[in-house]
Every structure is written in structure tokens, then in C-alpha cells.
Amino acid sequence: MRVLMIIPAYNEEESIFDTVTSILNYRKKVDFDLDYVVINDGSTDMTKQILEENHFNAVHLVMNLGIGGAVQTGYKYALAHDYDVAVQFDGDGQHDIESLSDLLEPIRKNEADLVIGSRFVGDVKSEFQTTFMRRFGIGVISNLIKWTTGQRVLDTTSGYRLADKVVIKQFARRYPIKYPEPETIVHILKRKYKVVEKPANMFERTGGVSSITPIKSIRYMLEVCSSILIAAFMRESE
């Protein structure tokens, strides 16, 4: 099985070296082929220089496309290079590479097409737990997804996700620009693909500063809910 880690990075000079190094160390002890590609999303700091100086595999976008455009670039790369599984893995050091093998199991067993690394399932809590307000917002989004698709997904905003070949093809063709995680869950469930949540450990970000503010959180909630409703009820070609 060939697995590709897609690492979107925008101004991650403080964390990108450690993020890639963690993958390089981890792949020495797994029984599948593990590759990676960093999608440098038009960074204006030293991210590009760090990637080039260390000869890390990367695609350098000439302008900032945002998280959706960067991740879709990674899925197009995975499709073009015929990977069996693509893994979204944040460049800021929040995702724990040690969770990967467990997350991969449902795809290996043909039990899932999309696996979501979740902070909210299982007996062992993730080292990083988000704020009450964000958990409340995630709960609202979860209820809306349940209402529109019939399936409960708890960690609707997790960026730690694994896609099999059929979902890679879907995401390479169509991927939302602004709020990709909740909207793509609806998109995949509408097409009767199997979505599974598995426990995943996550850390506090190791570098940079989160841009989330209370005002942005409220706007995010309104826009995400709108995008979910549009995705749920619009007709699209396969």
C-alpha cells in the first residue's frame, strides 16, 4: 500500500522541519510505503528556504490559495502519482504521526473510504482539547451534518483525515476553498461513501499564532452552516 502525507503549509517556518522529520522517522518502522509532499501555500516567511535547504519534497505555489486550494493541490498530486491513500497532515505540528497506523486500519480492511482522526471518540483523550466555544460550534456543525446526511460525525473540523483512492479522485476534482472539512464530509456522505472516525492524538501547535478570534468564530459558524446546507441540497454531477 502506497500512502501519501499531504502537508499544507503557510508561514510554518517554526514547525515545518520537525513536522517533516517526524514523518521521515516514522516511516522507518511501518509496513507500508509512506511518502509526503509539502504544499507551500505562497509562504512569505522562511518556509520555502527551509524546504529547499533540506531537500524536502514540496510543491511551491506562487500565490496563497488558502487551505482548500493547498489541500486540493495535494490530492491532485496523489491522483497523478497513483497513491492508494492520501493523508491530510497539518504543517503546524498539531497532528501526531504515531496515530497514523491505527487510522489506516479501516481503509486497509475496506471498512471506510474516508477516515477522520477525532479528538472526541475513544477512551483516551487527545493531548490537545479545544476551547468550550469551539467545541460548542463543532457540536452545532455535527448536528447539522446529522440532520442533512443521517450520520453523526463528532470531530467535524478535524484536519487529520485519510482518503482512499475513490475519495482522492473526488477531492482532486472538487474541493471547497474556505471551509473544506465539514462541507466535504457532507459531499462524501451524500455519495454513500463510508466515513469512519478513529481516535487521534493532537498537540498544541508548535509554532505560529492561531488567527481565530470570537468575531471570526461567529462568522465561521454562520458561513459553515450555510455551506453545509448548500452542499446537502444542491445537485451535482458525479
Predicted regions mapped to residue ranges:
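Hydrophobic helical membrane-anchoring modules
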Residues: 1-3, 143, 148-150, 173-238
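A conserved acidic beta->alpha catalytic loop
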Residues: 40-48, 93
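Short beta-strand/loop segment that forms part of the nucleotide-sugar
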Residues: 7, 20, 32-42, 89
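Catalytic metal- and UDP-sugar-binding loop of GT-A-like glycosyltransferases, i.e.
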Residues: 61, 89-91
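Acceptor/aglycone-binding surface of glycosyltransferases and processive sugar-polymer synthases
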Residues: 63, 67-80, 85, 97-178, ...
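Donor nucleotide-sugar binding loop of glycosyltransferases
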Residues: 12-15, 43, 96
